[in-house]
Amino acid sequence: MKKITKLIFTMLAISCMGAHAQETAEMVYPQAEWSKAGDILMHTPGQELFNGVIHPSAGLFENYFDVDIAAEEHRGYISMLEANGIRVHKVLDILREVGLDSLRQLATNVLKYDISSMPDEDAEKTENYRQEVLNKMSRNDLIRCILLQPTVKLSKTDNNTGYEAQYIQNPLMNLYFTRDQSITTPRGHIICNMNSNQRAPETEIINLCYEHLGLKPIMRITGEGRLEGGDYIPAGNISLIGCGMRTNDEGIRQMMEADAFGHDTIVVVRDHKLWQMQMHLDTHFNIIDKDLCTMVSSRLNAQPGAPEYNTCDIWARTPGTKEYKLWKQDQPFVEYIRGRGFQIIPIDINDEMHYANNFLTIAPRHIMAVGGQSEELQQRLREAGVNVEWIPLESLIDGYGAAHCMTQVLQREAYHPGVDPADVRSVNALTGESQSSYLLNGTMANENDRGVIIQNGKKVIRK
């Protein structure tokens, strides 16, 4: 694992088929959602996921899903990203490389011995015993400790060793949604303050990952402030930030006060519906290119006063100054987006419920999206010149998230406002037959492969 040692660096972008090297491009902290992605942070779920699926609602999930299949889907997604020349930094790989002292400190913070039912127990003796165990732990067991967050509830007994225990775990089953624990603005990385207490420890792991990569975060949201990465979208010379179920005004205020957005215009998109299925901005709005975006139909067609009707507040400052001032308030979000020159592709309800809107843009008019969407949506995307790589994520999406939620983009190509997407549009105007086909493990299928294939967004069986 190589550290990203400079804020701005260059890397050699490799074509999807690996056949031709393209020209060296400047990579920076993301300025625009549609710029070519270079580095992404991800976490393939493992044992920590199981506790979440045995009571999905309590785990912040939508339905039960198979842990092993979910992990295989995730590995397939990573393979598809890497096939596009993107460097994927994996949380587990980083934890296997960080300094042992840092890892042990993180484990020390989460391993608990509960002696509340033993009032006569010597607390100092218990703590010394806990430290002794931690000091003996192997690296892999320290990682297990960090991911499973165990508590040992002790009680006395006259049998055997004199102790017995209940073992309680609070595993980080949502860690694979690496979009949420932080956001990456043109200024750098901000560590979030999660809306859910059970997700709060995830931020410490992500913070450690950044430091190991040489990307020390510039700030952390604290106190009553709430901020989650799914609510943030960089859009060229503006920042879009959702305010609703998971992000609040105080979190946004802290960012503006710290000059953490890196843009002179901040658009606060207000969610009045507060619905779990649309918990973040990226679940009902997303950007494909500088003049093309998507929005779920219920938001796009909503009338003023309806819960689905999004409004936005626009904060601005004079370039070169720090203080933002409220410029416009309660503006219709759809009108604002169209006024900035965006064509909006509608996402109908059936596709929305299959997480069609939660795609990842990896280059102008080139997205990674959940397979199995309607032919109508696929046609709309083709007509707009969008190159879609359809990903099999049938299990993982039952965690209330998809391709965008599972990625934290660390670096993208530098944004150049003068680039016209017309050439990109003509290159990507693909027919249904020319869309790529993939095996279930995410590798590209060839004409000789048989069995279940993901082709044009749908599962087909080749005999």
PLM regions and their residue ranges:
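C-terminal tail/sorting-segment detector
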Residues: 420, 452-463
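Residue-level detector of functionally pivotal "anchor" positions at catalytic/ligand-binding pockets or at interdomain
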Residues: 419-443
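Short, isolated positions in well-ordered beta-strands
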Residues: 239-240, 445, 460-461
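Conserved beta-loop-beta connector loops within the AMP-binding
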Residues: 444-451
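Short capping micro-motif at the N-terminus of alpha-helices
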Residues: 370, 406, 447, 462-463
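The feature marks the mature, well-folded catalytic cores of soluble enzymes
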Residues: 22-418
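First exposed extracellular module after export/assembly in secreted or surface-exposed proteins
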Residues: 403, 432-433, 449
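Bacterial Sec-dependent N-terminal signal peptides
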Residues: 1-23
